[in-house]
């Protein structure tokens, strides 16, 4: 009710007692009939209480992290889940939100701390006879962590691509039917089609969900010599994006030199199957001939790459893992030089441990938190 005793809404009130709530604090939720007038009236009433204010974007999640309910990777997983557009993105975000990456990091960190402690014991008793040679156990610990971290780093590219989208570039000479094929794949007129060569002068992007995988199709400018200045700019961009794409679909005639070097898994097709006597390895965006088969091939290729995807889904994760791996490699290198170098090895391990702690948000993250939480809605 408002200050005059008039009913504002008939609502559901839920209470969550800390530390078992999402934030770890005592929380009350009002489930209202969500009209603008009702929400405005309730907010006006609540603002009259001392000590109340609107939450900052992501503040509830930030409190959950500060209260130990989530680590930083889980916070990012929650953000990715909110933004997920495809089934692969949803599943990946849930894996990160569930804390699997943080659990891995905790195991690695504990092993590195154990290794550093063993080295420190040897350093502390350098002038005395240490009854046990710690180097075999330290080496075993470091080798195990190193293998795990390198394996995780190897899967970061695909993990990042699932989050942001795989790029598939359609490449060929001008008027080869690239824009028509893009429109056929997208199911709409996303690119201008014309019989005039060079109609597409910039890279056109279309986001799609292919079998649950996020894919951005790139319609590139036709690659040819002797183009005018404006078209040449588009051609340069097309070459760059084509080389950087995760997969390339070439529309090329038999014996024609490919304008961008093909790599494993790239697809080469003959354009305009509707105008050919033989449709072998040909495709037509006009009639749709070969389009379903192309979609199946793209799904199969990208799907196979996604089978062993890692949990490090952000560039920040990859950078932290690489820093940790660098410290670990340096420690392993000096460890071979004997006990005289154990102090250096121990220091390198501390660098490696700090990188892992930054990954899960234990240290050096204040500036980063402001950026991450600013992308959350008020209700999170």
Question: What name fits each language-model region?
Answer:
Residues 1-91, 95, 99:
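A glycine-rich (often HGG/GG-containing) alpha/beta subdomain
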């Amino acid at each position: 009710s408002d200050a005059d005793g008039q009913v504002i809404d008939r609502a559901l009130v839920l209470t969550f007692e800390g530390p078992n709530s999402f934030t770890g604090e005592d929380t009350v939720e009002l489930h209202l009939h969500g009209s603008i007038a009702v929400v405005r009236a309730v907010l006006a009433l609540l603002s009259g209480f001392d000590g109340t204010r609107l939450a900052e974007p992501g503040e509830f999640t930030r409190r959950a992290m500060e209260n130990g309910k989530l680590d930083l990777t889980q916070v990012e997983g929650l953000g990715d889940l909110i933004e997920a557009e495809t089934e692969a993105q949803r599943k990946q975000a849930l894996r990160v939100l569930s804390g699997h990456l943080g659990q891995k990091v905790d195991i690695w960190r504990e092993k590195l701390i154990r290794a550093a402690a063993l080295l420190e014991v040897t350093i502390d008793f350098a002038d005395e006879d240490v009854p046990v040679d710690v180097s075999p156990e330290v080496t075993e610990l470091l080798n195990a962590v190193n293998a795990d971290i390198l394996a995780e780093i190897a899967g970061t590219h695909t993990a990042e691509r699932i989050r942001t989208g795989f790029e598939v570039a359609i490449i060929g000479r001008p008027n080869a039917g690239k824009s028509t094929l893009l429109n056929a794949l997208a199911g709409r007129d996303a690119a201008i089609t014309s019989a005039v060569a060079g109609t597409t002068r910039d890279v056109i992007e279309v986001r799609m969900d292919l079998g649950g995988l996020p894919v951005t199709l790139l319609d590139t400018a036709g690659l040819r010599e002797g183009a005018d200045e404006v078209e040449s700019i588009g051609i340069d961009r097309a070459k760059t994006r084509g080389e950087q794409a995760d997969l390339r679909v070439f529309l090329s005639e038999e014996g024609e030199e490919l304008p961008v070097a093909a790599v494993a898994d790239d697809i080469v097709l003959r354009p305009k199957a509707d105008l050919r006597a033989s449709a072998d390895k040909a495709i037509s965006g006009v009639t749709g001939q070969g389009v379903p088969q192309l979609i199946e091939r793209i799904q199969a290729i990208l799907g196979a790459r996604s089978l062993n995807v890692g949990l490090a889904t952000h560039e920040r994760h990859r950078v932290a893992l690489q820093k940790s791996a660098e410290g670990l490699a340096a420690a392993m290198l000096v460890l071979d030089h004997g006990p005289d170098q154990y102090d250096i090895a121990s220091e390198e391990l501390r660098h490696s441990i700090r990188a892992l702690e930054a990954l899960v948000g234990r240290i050096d993250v204040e500036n980063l938190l402001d950026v991450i939480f600013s992308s959350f809605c008020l209700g999170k």
